[in-house]
Amino acid sequence: MSIFVANKEIAERKDIINPNLINNSATLNGFFNAYGDLPQIDDAKYQGLRVINQTNMQWRGSGPYMYVQKGTYTFSCYAKTSGLGVKSIMIPLNTGLDGKDKQPATVNTQAMAISSVSDWSRFDCTFVVSEAGYIHPRVESSGNNDVLLLAGFKLEKGSVATPWCPSINDLATGLLDIQAIKSKLGGVKLLYRIYYATSLKEVA
């Protein structure tokens, strides 16, 4: 099953969207760095998504903590960067910090460098989990004076990155919120639509 908020053209192309396994990827609720700090949120949004501002933050990347089973996964996000430090997508727990109370997953990819880009670009990293456990997908910078803006985190099964979408849980919550608004307004029809697409693919 693939469920997401998007336009009709995308919704009808059932072959290109995989469910997002990350909850709250638009709001960034439940995102932390290895020290337990909440992410710094930028005032601006990108495509309606809240933006993590990791400017001047060395090795303090924020992301969700997730328990994953064995298999192949792809992580992707939007990024806008500058500065001389190396920026990298990191998947495993930060050994010695956030791995103290969590069983870490065994993954074949420790880090994947991404380029510095002055305009928003989407980056992705495919990795294989050989032993189930926790991961902490995030983007880190090695420099103290770098600009690193991030949005639209997505984790999906398989080796292909597909367009960002909310998780199925997020969409279900959104539908309940919409129903509550409609009831409050006396059944007034809202001026937008939520499209969804389904297939027989396993998602959990």
Task: Locate the predicted segments by residue.
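Secreted extracellular polysaccharide-interacting domains
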Residues: 50-69, 88, 100-110, 135-138
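Extracellular beta-strand-rich recognition modules
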Residues: 75-77, 133-141, 153
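Short edge-strand/loop segments of extracellular domains
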Residues: 92-100
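Short, surface-exposed loop/turn segments at beta-strand-coil junctions that are enriched for proline
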Residues: 82, 128-132, 142-144
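Extracellular polysaccharide-targeting segments
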Residues: 1-30, 140-202
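Extracellular carbohydrate recognition and processing domains
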Residues: 100-134
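Short carbohydrate-recognition loop motifs
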Residues: 36-58
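Extra-cytoplasmic beta-strand recognition segments
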Residues: 27, 55-89, 123-128, 152-153
